[in-house]
Curated annotation (Swiss-Prot):
GO terms for molecular function: 5'-3' exonuclease activity; 5'-flap endonuclease activity; DNA binding; metal ion binding. This is Putative endonuclease L386. Residues 444-459 have a biased composition (Basic and acidic residues). Signal peptide: none annotated. It is an enzyme of class 3 (hydrolase). Its EC number is 3.1.-.-. Residues 288-297, 310-332 have a biased composition (Acidic residues). The keyword Repeat does not apply. Keywords: Endonuclease, Hydrolase, Magnesium, Metal-binding, Nuclease. SUPFAM superfamilies: 5' to 3' exonuclease, C-terminal subdomain (SSF47807), PIN domain-like (SSF88723). Binds 2 magnesium ions per subunit. They probably participate in the reaction catalyzed by the enzyme. May bind an additional third magnesium ion after substrate binding.
Amino acid sequence: MGIKGLFKLLREKIKEEEKEGLKRKELGIPDDDTKIKYKPLTVYRFRRLKGITVAIDASLAIYRMVYGKLKSGPSLVNREGKLTSHLRGIFYNVLTFLQNDIIPIYVFDGKAPDIKSKTIEKRKLRKDRFKLTSEDIKEVQILLDLMGIPYIIAPGEADVICSWLCARHDSNGKRYVKGVCTEDSDMLPLGAPYMFKDMLGLNNLNKNIIIVKLKDVLGFLGLTMNEFIDLCVLLGCDYCDNIKGIGPKNAYKLIVEYRTLDKVLEFLHKSNKITSTKTNKTISNNSDDSDNSDDSDNEIKDSNKIDISNDLEDSEENSDDSDSSDEASDSTENEICMLKAAEYFRTALKEIDESKTFVLTDDQLKLRQYQHDELMDFMCVKHNFDPRSIKNGIDRLNSYNKSMNITRPNKKVYHKIIEPKGVTIPSLSDDINFIDSDTDSDTDSDKENNESEKFESKNSRSKTNLIKRNSRS
């Protein structure tokens, strides 16, 4: 899910700044250099990122592959009826990364933190959601091993390890990865310096992606890292709900005014503008309680007071005592979650730094040689993919291995070959079905030639008659 409304807020602030810039230009006022130098959202052509290493949230990538296929057509399944769309998607996505000389490091979720338990329960209740099983994950890991692609199984959330890889340096003083390839903005309050949006599922080097630079986001919004974390929590994230009636613009105004989440919550309580996270009975009818809302009716009236409501409804007249009690309980519970979420964002990477069990190996960070026969068997025999397409993909993989000089061995057994004789790749001629009347006899050939001559002669006469008619006119 990520941070609710964060990118909406950034885009709207960018538009506002662009309008202000045009006004300053018309009035002959110099541009505000402090704003110009910050570019929180930058559009890049994918091929420009050549030669880097990226961390990828594996679970998110799998979901994107499955739902992407659902939008374009029926899902792919193997002979046993098991879904395989994600395997095909990961296979070709890896090839696109390698084609651009990019090393992908996939990171899989471990045990979810207790703070995320409510979010997980909500997701389980969604009937239309693709359920990612342990078998699905294992199959993707086998595919990556056979292709020689590194991956990490996180001790906790993949988000944290992805952000840690991006923020920390190896023994040579170089960051493990340049950025995190994800659509989940949780990476930013966790401390990932770079986030790459719209890169999952990419299969074209000429496509555009969006690079989100944390340093520029902070500078553009005029916030410290701690203030930005509090803003993200106030907006709502995977670990807590947002406060109903307070959308992106008002959340930003509150953080700018009060600077900390504690003081914002204190202000809201004193102003009687917060009692529940499930209803907005104490919030204005004009409040911005969704990511698509407009904050035009909720402005800062002066430097000492923020007005986020106009016509407050009387909660006592519109609810009974039990409802009020439930609302207060909901509010208190969510506020506790918000404070825990802020602390989690601040300390998650430090816990990895101090962990004595989290150790990285070369196999988790570097490319290895691929296993040709096993990969063909895994994809074509076990999962029923077209042999010719997979063979073409493996040929591409071989060329990228050579161009990237991948020499690290990969001899461990990840998949036991099902068809020892190898996968049969049908020739093009096998795909041609001749009908009974098709023969190679000379008489039939002569007949076809005669028919062809008659057709050409008829066309010639038609053209001649047309020329004569045109000349008469």
